[in-house]
């Protein structure tokens, strides 16, 4: 295959996250409203496919040597679309189930922190870019993104299927979901602090500029 075709395949894989994650939203809402396990499974499969596309688009781009500036910009944008859709959907499902106000609160804090962190880091990078700083993704940001995909899938799997499990299993699984959310909340706060520290000199320069 030509490099042009390779590039088209990689870009299609990257952008496939948008229809997949919106299809997840629809299936997850319908599954909750209709109490349909089949729709819940379909929603889980759609989320998994959207998440796995993030793993393979970059891998194929490097394998086929079609890494591009467009791809480097599109990939994090598609990641943001995934999280902006998936986490509020999870929050809605928790609220619709009405079983745990505490879990809803934890998920609300997590979702708000996640979105605010992304906006803050984007702002810091924009300021630093004006001074020609290196604004590439840090390893911490990559780890956060890599962990967030399976975390979202795990949380949804619990929400969709926990009522089918024996009561003795539900407590430990709920604790594991809280643990996952707690780790990601801490990682978001830490990531925000690290990016702020790195780009702080450029922010100070921008504030003092006339």
Provide a role label for each language-model segment:
Residues 1-11, 15-21, 38-51, 128, ...:
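C-terminal membrane-associated helical module and adjoining short loops/tails
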Residues 12, 19-73, 85-93, 100-114, ...:
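Membrane-embedded alpha-helical segments that form the functional core of polytopic membrane enzymes
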Residues 16-24, 76-90, 117-122, 144-156:
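Core segments of transmembrane alpha-helices
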Residues 28-32, 93-96, 129, 158-162:
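Short helix-capping/hinge motifs at transmembrane helix termini and TM-loop junctions
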Residues 54-57, 75, 79, 118, ...:
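Acidic side chains
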Residues 115-134:
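Membrane-proximal helix-loop-helix units in multi-pass membrane proteins
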């Amino acid at each position: 295959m030509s490099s042009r075709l390779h590039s088209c395949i990689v870009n299609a894989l990257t952008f496939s996250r948008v229809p997949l994650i919106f299809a997840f939203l629809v299936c997850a809402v319908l599954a909750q409203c209709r109490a349909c396990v089949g729709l819940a499974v379909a929603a889980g499969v759609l989320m998994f496919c959207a998440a796995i596309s993030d793993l393979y688009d970059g891998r194929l781009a490097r394998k086929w040597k079609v890494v591009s500036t467009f791809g480097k910009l599109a990939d994090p944008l598609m990641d943001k679309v995934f999280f902006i859709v998936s986490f509020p959907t999870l929050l809605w499902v928790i609220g619709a189930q009405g079983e745990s106000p505490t879990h809803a609160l934890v998920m609300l804090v997590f979702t708000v922190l996640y979105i605010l962190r992304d906006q803050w880091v984007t702002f810091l990078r924009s300021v630093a870019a004006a001074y020609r700083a290196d604004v590439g993704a840090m390893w911490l940001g990559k780890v956060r993104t890599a962990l967030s995909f399976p975390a979202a899938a795990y949380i949804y799997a619990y929400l969709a299927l926990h009522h089918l499990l024996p009561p003795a299993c539900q407590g430990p699984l709920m604790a594991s979901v809280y643990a996952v959310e707690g780790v990601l909340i801490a990682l978001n706060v830490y990531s925000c602090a690290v990016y702020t520290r790195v780009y702080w000199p450029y922010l100070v320069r921008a504030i003092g500029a006339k």
